[in-house]
Amino acid sequence: MTKMKIATFGFTASLLAVAAQAATPPAIYTAAQATAGASAFSQNCAMCHGANLEGGAGPALVGQAFAAASNNYTVGAIFTELSQQMPAGQPGSLTHTQYEDIMAYILKQNGYPAGTTAISYDKAMGDSTPLVSQVK
């Protein structure tokens, strides 16, 4: 019986470790991109989406109202919308770098950690990474 309890405990601990690892969002942008993105967002997006991404004339870009798991959003889908349709009235008018940086800022504000590899325009367009806000 004791061996069974130990085995069960070990199995349960393994499952919890796997679940915790799966719940950690990937690091797909750099801190420098998110910093630059905050400035680019403030200049080009905040007037519609709010200074804190809370929404206004445009939808919120942070939290569960934006990216709940049930929405099935991906980084690629959101980046494509961002880079092809924004800013409103001037779609596609920013540089690739500005779009990359704004996406990094949105990811940061939604609880995604920064990493050592920069998000790139071409990679972001087809990125199938689920976008689920870690902000409740």
Q: Language-model features: where?
A:
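Positively charged n-region of N-terminal signal peptides that target proteins for export
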Residues: M1-I6
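The canonical Cys-X-X-Cys-His
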Residues: G37, F41-A51, I102, I106
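Electrostatic cytochrome c docking/interface patches
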Residues: Q21-A40
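Bacterial N-terminal signal peptides
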Residues: T8-V18
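Gly/Gly-Pro-rich "capping" loops immediately C-terminal to redox-active cysteine motifs
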Residues: A31-A34, E54-P87
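Flexible coil segments in periplasmic/lumen-exposed cytochrome c-class electron-transfer proteins
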Residues: P91-K136
